[in-house]
C-alpha cells in the first residue's frame, strides 16, 4: 500500500499500448490505400484526357499546336492545368511563368486539390450534356477553370498570403466573370454551369456535389458583419439567377428555383421558389424524393409539374 495521500502512478498496460499502436497502424494503412486509389484515378483520367487531345489534334490540325502546349506536352494533370491557368490569367505585369510556378507548387503540395479537380471534371462530364469530353472541360469550361483557380487563391488565403490571393481573385473575376472571394470554402464535385455572373461572398460555404447555374449570388444582406453569407449543403441545385442572402442554411439535397430570392433557411431535401422565396411541399409532401440528388440529377422543373400550388 502506498503512503496516505501519495498519488499512485499507473503506467498504461501493454495491452492498451498495443491496441493504440494497432489502431494508428490501421488508420495509416487505410489512408495509404485511399491515397493510392486517388493517385490511380487521377492517372487514369489523365491518360484518357491525353487520348482525347490526340484524337482532336488528328481530327482538327488547326488545334494541334494548342493541344500539344496545353495537354500533350505535360506529364500530369497538375502540370497541364497549372500551365493553362497561368496563360489564361496572366497579364502584362503578372507573368504566366510566375503563375505557372504558383499553381503547380500549390497543387503539388496538397493532393486534396488534385482530387477535387478530378471530381469537378467528372461532375461536368456527367451532369452537362454539352460537355463532349474531359479535355473539352479542362480547356474550355470557364466555370471549371474559375473553381480550380479559386482553390489556389483559397489556399493562399489560409496561408495568410492575402495580397496575392486577392490579386489572383481579381484576375479570376476579370477573365472568367466569376467572383468568388478567396476566403469562401468550396467542396468537390462542383459544377458551375455557364458560370457567368456567379458571385460567392467571403464567409459562404458550398458543400460537395453541388451544381450552380449562371448569375447566382451567394451574398450578404448588407446589414451584417462577420459570418454573413449562405451555407450550401451537399448535393444542392441552385437555379439560374437565384439570389441567396445572409447567413442562411440551404440543407443537403435542397433545390432553389431559378430567379428566386432566398432570405430564409431551406430544409434538407426542400425546395424554395419565388421572390421572396417560399418553401414548396413541406414535411408532409417533400418535393425531393430520397433517391434524388438535385445537384447531380440537374432537374430544374420537377417541382412545377408536381405541385399545383406553385406560384412565382
From Swiss-Prot:
Tagged with keyword Cytoplasm: yes
Matching Gene3D superfamilies: Hexapeptide repeat proteins (2.160.10.10), serine acetyltransferase, domain 1 (1.10.3130.10)
GO BP: cysteine biosynthetic process from serine
Regulation of this protein's activity per its record: Feedback inhibitions by L-Ser and acetyl-CoA.
Region ranges (Disordered): 1-25
UniProt EC number: 2.3.1.30
Biased composition (Basic and acidic residues): 1-17
Sorted UniProt keywords: Acyltransferase, Amino-acid biosynthesis, Cytoplasm, Transferase
Pathway in which the depicted protein is active: Amino-acid biosynthesis; L-cysteine biosynthesis; L-cysteine from L-serine: step 1/2
Tissue-specificity statement: Mostly expressed in stems, flowers and siliques. Localized in vascular tissues, particularly in phloem.
Pfam families with a match to the protein in the record: Hexapep, SATase_N
Catalytic activity: L-serine + acetyl-CoA = O-acetyl-L-serine + CoA
InterPro entries: Hexapep (IPR001451), Hexapep_transf_CS (IPR018357), LbH_SAT (IPR045304), Ser_AcTrfase_N (IPR010493), Ser_AcTrfase_N_sf (IPR042122), Ser_O-AcTrfase (IPR005881), Serine_acetyltransferase (IPR053376), Trimer_LpxA-like_sf (IPR011004)
Induction: By cadmium (Cd). Not induced under sulfur-deficient conditions.
Record localization: Cytoplasm
MF annotations from Gene Ontology: serine O-acetyltransferase activity
Quaternary organization: Homomultimer.
Protein name: Serine acetyltransferase 5
Amino acid at each position: 500500500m502506498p503512503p496516505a495521500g501519495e498519488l499512485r502512478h499507473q503506467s498504461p498496460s501493454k495491452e492498451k499500448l498495443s491496441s493504440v499502436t494497432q489502431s494508428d497502424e490501421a488508420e495509416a494503412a487505410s489512408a495509404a490505400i485511399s491515397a493510392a486509389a486517388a493517385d490511380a484515378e487521377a492517372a487514369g483520367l489523365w491518360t484518357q484526357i491525353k487520348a482525347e487531345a490526340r484524337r482532336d489534334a488528328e481530327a482538327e490540325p488547326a488545334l494541334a499546336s494548342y493541344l500539344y502546349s496545353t495537354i500533350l506536352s505535360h506529364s500530369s494533370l497538375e502540370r497541364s492545368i497549372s500551365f493553362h491557368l497561368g496563360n489564361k490569367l496572366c497579364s502584362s505585369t503578372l507573368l504566366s511563368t510566375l503563375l505557372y510556378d504558383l499553381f503547380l507548387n500549390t497543387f503539388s503540395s496538397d493532393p486534396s486539390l488534385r482530387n477535387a479537380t478530378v471530381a469537378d471534371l467528372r461532375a461536368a462530364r456527367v451532369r452537362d450534356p454539352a460537355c463532349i469530353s474531359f479535355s473539352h472541360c479542362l480547356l474550355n469550361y470557364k466555370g471549371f477553370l474559375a473553381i480550380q483557380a479559386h482553390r489556389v487563391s483559397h489556399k493562399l488565403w489560409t496561408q495568410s498570403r492575402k495580397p496575392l490571393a486577392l490579386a489572383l481573385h481579381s484576375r479570376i473575376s476579370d477573365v472568367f466573370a466569376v467572383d468568388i472571394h478567396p476566403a469562401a470554402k468550396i467542396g468537390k464535385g462542383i459544377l458551375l454551369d455557364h458560370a457567368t455572373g456567379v458571385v460567392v461572398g467571403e464567409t459562404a460555404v458550398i458543400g460537395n456535389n453541388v451544381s450552380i447555374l449562371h448569375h447566382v449570388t451567394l451574398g450578404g444582406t448588407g446589414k451584417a458583419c462577420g459570418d454573413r453569407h449562405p451555407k450550401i449543403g451537399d448535393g444542392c441545385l441552385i437555379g439560374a439567377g437565384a439570389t441567396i442572402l445572409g447567413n442562411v442554411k440551404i440543407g443537403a439535397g435542397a433545390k432553389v428555383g431559378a430567379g428566386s430570392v432566398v432570405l430564409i433557411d431551406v430544409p434538407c431535401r426542400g425546395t424554395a421558389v419565388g421572390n421572396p422565396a417560399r418553401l414548396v411541399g413541406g414535411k408532409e409532401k417533400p418535393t425531393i424524393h430520397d433517391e434524388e440528388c438535385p445537384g447531380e440529377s440537374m432537374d430544374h422543373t420537377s417541382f412545377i409539374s408536381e405541385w399545383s400550388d406553385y406560384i412565382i
